[in-house]
Amino acid sequence: MVYLSHMETRSCQKCEKNFNIEPEDFKFYEKMGVLAPTWCPDCRLQRRLSFRNERTLYKRPCELCGIDTISRFDPIRGIVNYCGECWWSDKWDPTTYGQDYDFSRPFFEQMGELIKKVPQQNLIVMYKTLTNSNFTNMNHYLKNCYYIFNSDYNEKCMYGEEMEHCTDCVDVTMAESTQLAYESFNCNKCYEIYYSVDCESSHDVWFSKNLMGCSNCFGCINLRGQQYCIFNEKYTREDYLKKLEEFNLNSNSSVQEIKEKAQKFWLKFPNKYMHGIQNLDSTGDYVFNSKYVKNSFITTGGEYCKYCMWLIVKNNKECYDFTQFGENTERVYESLCSGKNINDIIGCINALEARELRYSIYSYNNNSNLFGCISLKNHSYCILNKQYSKEEYEEMLPKIIKHMNDMPYVDKKGRKYVYGDFFPTEIAQFNYNETSAQEFFPLTQEEAINQGFSWKEPKERNYKISIVSKNIPDDIKFVSENIVQEILGCEHEGNCKEQCTIAFRITEPEFQFYKAHKLPLPHLCPNCRHYQRVLNRNPNKFWRRKCMKEGCSNEFETAYAPDRPEIVYCEKCYNQEVY
């Protein structure tokens, strides 16, 4: 392989937009032994996310023991579903599904067959660490939690995601060490926080954004160490509490009016160009404690990484196109949901404590030197789940890599996939609208099909909505516990791109939470609430802009698009404004 010492511009195979490959990118691809990509970063991310089903769950039996499970896999997709206990047990041997490598067919075609044969775990969880938290996914160490995802070490939380060490949080996304939170986003070390965004070390906060070390604030933004403020105006304690009673926070209509007012008020104040601290020469958003990290998103403790996302556990070095997890990783490329002491990984899904893996799925417990394997634990030198000697494996590996480049997989749209490319979506276990791809790259059914994705048609359900959205009681004071027997209609009625379930229920713990904190009932189903909440999160796209502070000439890359209404400052000007 010959690599360039200067930037090259290519046209994406999928979207046909131009993208750049920098000299340092070519050096990374050379180190990994892969061809430079022919898909742009956005389309590569979209394809990886189409293999990530976080929140679309089904009831289906384990195909080994017969027990009913909550599963990520739609029964009609043909994936063999095992419960956690059976999948981790020694009752079966995944190498019995091994198959010979066929040099007369593309590799990804053979991998697609193996995906349908080898049993896969129903959920991505450490099932022994879950207590009364069955209806969850991508979690461990939960107690009494319901419908939360990609979260760890939580108790009594509902309808949330990306939460760590939280208690009594409902409808919350991106939170750490937070207690008693509702309808909030990106909160760290907070207590009693409601309808708020980007807050840290604060308590008793309502409808506020970017507060630090504050308490008893309502509708505020960019405050530091303040208390008893309403829309950034200082009050006495007595006047603050009196004013708070006037807002009628029991009422959904009042809450919606205050939300709108607060969001308009926030637009009068500057935002820092990125969310992040203690970074060196790094670009992206929600990037922390990182060095030389470029175009990455929600990443902590990275070094020389690019196009990465959701690497929330630190110490990740020389990783490209790596989505979710992290923790002591090095030289990872085009991989998903992997981490914890891994290195030299290409095109893998759910690889933990492993090294020298290629195109392997659900690889746990010290695997090494695997190619195209599924559900192996503590194995080495396997190809398509078939065991080889070290010498046989090392002889076959370069032949397979050459074969993948000489006979690439070609999808129905005519797009080619060679060694180094992530799996084609055509062999995914999920439909597009079941996955995180729909969240970050929302499509209609027609758009998805035209782009080569599959789509899950809505299933007819045997229920009748008993209370349509407009008739849901406005004030929690007038709601009895009988509400848990009702089927409520979602306000969106399925007319959105938010995986709307059209109808939903209020659970008993959920009702008790609303009653205890005097909060109105939601008018949207959990999925639509999630999609509305993450509108507070900047997109994983970046633009070159200038600081909007008068007289400042600083430039930066930011996730705030030029046509957005927010005021955006460089770090220096922002800090001068708020500190």
Can you annotate each of these PLM segments?
Residues 2-579:
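Long, distal/terminal scaffolding or interaction modules
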